[in-house]
Amino acid sequence: MVAKNVDNPWLIGYFVGNEPAWINDEVRLCQIILDGPDRPIKAALKKYLESNADTDENRVAFIYDAFDKFLETVDKVYKKYDPHHLNLGMRFANPDTITETLLSICGKHFDVFSFNAYMLAPDKDMLDRAYACTGKPMIVGEYHFGTVDRGLAQALWQTDSEKDRADCYRYYTENAYAHPAFIGSGYFQWSDQDITGRFDGENYNCGLVDVTDRPYKAMVDAMIATAECLYDVHC
């Protein structure tokens, strides 16, 4: 995958994962490893705990060490086979839930710190903390707004109308780019989801177009207006 894109001028970089489920559940993750089939990581964990005592703190430390090594390995592969593109991080959920130690590990290996943030707008204190710990520029990988007036579920952040949805898009995006370390955002998603739902039943009104490819004019106009002012908004 990496090698075939090495000279692609339209590619910014690669994400190395998405919303890892083990964040703040490292102790339980260790138990799952110990209860599971024999694997190299199980042997390494048992050896680590035997040498350092089986405590919650040591279990967390082991997972952090393993994660550090994983990120180091992945980044070396990226840099070896495609030095022209960025390591865009792991698209964590709310970075406020991530410890400063873990954020610092991310800062060692990512070119960009990425996270998904379904909220009215990214909190400045949250962005300040993430940047202070990682030292990396930041992008939001996912955010959106929806309504219930289209016969679909309202999405992860509900508004009352299509106009409100467009206003919320502008408020979120322009507030995010007002932070000097914020460099990109990805709206989720291009089209509404089918009323019958995707693989997990999710059927949100969150698109820029509906399921018959008809644009939501308010959203399109809002995106144009925001795009035209972003360089003025960005510090």
Model-predicted segments: where are they?
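Surface-exposed, flexible loop/turn segments at secondary-structure boundaries
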Residues: W22, P95, A121, G146, ...
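Aromatic-rich peripheral "rim/lid" segments of glycoside hydrolase catalytic domains that contact
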Residues: Q31-K46, F188-C235
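Phosphate/diphosphate-binding loops
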Residues: M1
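Alpha-helix termination/capping residues and helix-transition junctions
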Residues: N5-N8, G107, H179
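Short, solvent-exposed loop/turn and secondary-structure capping segments
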Residues: N24-L29, D125, R150-G151, G197-R198
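Polysaccharide-binding and catalytic clefts of secreted carbohydrate-active enzymes
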Residues: W10-T101
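Glycoside hydrolase catalytic-domain groove-lining segments
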Residues: A61, D65-K76, K80-A155, R170, ...
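Substrate-binding cleft of secreted/luminal carbohydrate-active enzymes
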Residues: L11-G13, N18, Y143, W157-V209, ...
